[in-house]
Design a protein with these regions (language model features):
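Buried hydrophobic packing segments
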Residues: 65-72, 95-104, 130, 290-294
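Active-site C-terminal subdomain of aminotransferase-like
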Residues: 219-222, 226-323, 328-330
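N-terminal entrance/gating region of PLP-dependent enzymes' catalytic architecture
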Residues: 1-83
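Conserved PLP-binding catalytic core of the aspartate aminotransferase-like
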Residues: 324-346
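Single conserved hydrophobic/aromatic residue that forms the stacking wall/gate
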Residues: 347-358
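Glycine- and acidic
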Residues: 48-57, 81-87, 140-146, 172-179, ...
């Protein structure tokens, strides 16, 4: 249903088909390669296709993106159908920044909060995209200490951190809870944050960074409540270019209805509909890739893949146990982090020149 910019007559669209002197749209192999064919067609998925209208020239691939978001929001993360907004972002870093941007503006608009009254609250193991968001959005970032062995947030240290922040004028908190940190695969308990903040009578919004664990944890821990069935969870991000093995960069931002409009850019007047995203123009080919992967596997096929990964991880951990090599691993994740004291430096590369350390 997309406009064919190679053969159709069209004017006035924010679109650009790939140069046909370099990228051949009639190459025979494209018939059996939907993602590559879409890549050449280059649909512009500018805007948010779960909220209001969008550029009508790309309604076909926009519908595929909406279906991908529905599968992730409803089937993966237990959201009620039609009660979510979101988009396929150029990566998890942008998706996390988008989440914090939405919450900052929510507090600005609904509480008349000043930026110096808002703080980001996250663990020491949180991804570096969060300090980026702190810098870009002019918000202070508070690092909650974690236990060295368990990687769990220290409740007492967290309480002291929040009390000090309140005494320094902080009134509103943007909480980032990790669904598998990049370095450890550790999973935060969101209740550690929310119980404390509610007990202190503080306003907050809770975001789940599932960039790594989003395609693993819902299938490896079927009893998990780190999803939209928990009314305290307002948004979730996932990276499809990690465990789903979609092309770089393919992140996903999901949130509850009533939030994303806080970042409406009214100045984007030439765009049909409303631009509620950080990136603006983005390729629709990523949506096709994610759709193909999800529907090729299906829920049972994906569950099987994750189960095999966990079996291999369990096997690897047993070998480490036999060798008395200490490590950290969340039982529901496929990341194993070894203690540096038990790694032979001879076989690790030096960060400076990539040569083996001696």
């Amino acid at each position: 249903e997309n406009v064919d910019f190679e053969n159709d007559t069209s004017l006035g669209y924010p679109a650009s088909k790939l140069d046909d002197k370099v990228f051949y749209s009639d190459a025979p192999f494209l018939k059996d390669a939907p993602t590559l064919k879409t890549y050449v067609a280059n649909p512009n998925h500018i805007g948010c296709h779960t909220f209001g209208s969008s550029e009508s020239a790309f309604k076909g691939t926009q519908e595929i993106e909406r279906e991908v978001l529905r599968v992730l929001a409803v089937d993966f993360f237990k959201m009620e159908d039609e009660q979510f907004d979101g988009y396929i972002a150029p990566g998890g870093t942008e998706a996390n920044i988008q989440a914090i941007w939405v919450f900052r503006n929510y507090f600005n608009h609904h509480f008349d909060a000043k930026n110096n009254e808002i703080a980001i609250l996250a663990s020491d193991d949180t991804h570096y995209s969060i300090p980026k968001a702190s810098n870009l959005l002019s918000l202070d970032l508070l690092h909650a200490p974690v236990d060295f062995k368990t990687r769990e947030i220290d409740p007492k240290a967290l309480e002291n951190l929040v009390q000090k922040a309140v005494s320094n004028g902080k009134k509103y908190f943007i909480v980032i809870a990790n669904m598998a940190t990049t370095m450890f695969g550790s999973v935060d308990d969101p209740d550690v944050y929310t119980d404390l903040l509610e007990g202190m009578g503080l306003d907050y919004k809770l975001h789940i960074d599932g960039a790594y664990g989003g395609f693993v944890y819902p299938f490896s821990n079927l009893k998990s409540k780190i999803n939209f069935s928990n009314p305290k969870v307002s948004s979730i991000t996932i990276d499809a270019h990690k465990m789903l093995q979609a092309p770089y960069g393919t992140g996903v931002y999901l949130c509850r209805k009533g939030l994303i409009e806080n970042v409406l850019t009214k100045e984007a007047e030439y765009v049909e509909g409303m631009d509620l995203t950080l990136c603006g123009s983005r390729s629709g080919a990523n949506a096709i890739a994610v759709y193909m992967i999800l529907f090729t596997y299906g829920p049972y096929g994906w569950y099987e893949k994750i189960s095999v990964l966990l079996m291999r991880t369990n096997w690897f951990c047993k070998q480490l146990d036999q060798l008395s090599i200490p490590y950290f691993r969340n039982e529901h994740m496929n990341i194993v982090t070894l203690y540096s004291s038990h790694i032979c430096l001879l076989y690790t590369s030096d960060a400076a020149d990539d040569r083996p350390r001696v």
